[in-house]
A protein has these predicted regions:
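N-terminal acidic leader/helix
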Residues: 2-26, 73-80
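Amphipathic alpha-helical interface segments used for dimerization/assembly
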Residues: 9-13, 17, 35-36, 40-44, ...
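Short, charge-rich amphipathic interface segments used for partner binding and complex assembly
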Residues: 29-67
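Short Cys/His-rich "knuckle" micro-motifs
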Residues: 98-102
Length: 145
């Protein structure tokens, strides 16, 4: 079962809060409202993950737009799987994940990202952290209208 972790939903909410801040401190942008409904249910039912099947369409669209703003791959161009390692020392993905990455769906990619981030032992998190794409400055959010 492919599932979205609550931390990704939080990150998507914060992404939209930066891009579409509340004009009055109360009103939420449609993307935030859609994601917040899912988040609230997860908190209420003490769930860490939401099944991707049946995810509300507006929340899914908002989540996908956030996902598109994240680095696609954890690769830092030091792939030890090409030398026979089962797990890449550079990014922390398994040989199979490296091979199948282009065809994986966003939810499965985010699950892999979560696993390697929690593990935190690959070189992208220490020795070669400067190579990590998420450490680079991205475009500024649009100003509120």
């Amino acid at each position: 079962m492919a599932a979205l972790h609550i931390t990704d939903i939080e990150a998507a909410i914060n992404y939209w809060r930066a891009r579409k801040p509340s004009p009055d401190g109360v009103t939420l942008a449609p993307e935030i409202r859609a994601l917040a409904e899912v988040y609230a249910l997860m908190v209420f039912f003490h769930e860490d993950e939401a099944d991707a099947r049946g995810f509300p369409p507006k929340a899914w669209d908002a989540w996908l737009q956030w996902y598109d703003s994240t680095p696609d791959t954890p690769c830092i161009a030091i792939c030890s799987t090409s030398q026979g390692d089962e797990v890449c020392k550079g990014c922390g993905r398994t040989f199979e994940e490296v091979q199948l990455w282009p065809g994986m769906d966003p939810v499965d990619k985010r699950a892999t990202w979560r696993r390697i981030t929690l593990d935190g032992t690959s070189w992208r998190f220490n020795r070669y952290a400067e190579r990590a794409a998420e450490g680079q400055a991205g475009p500024e959010p649009a100003a509120a209208a």
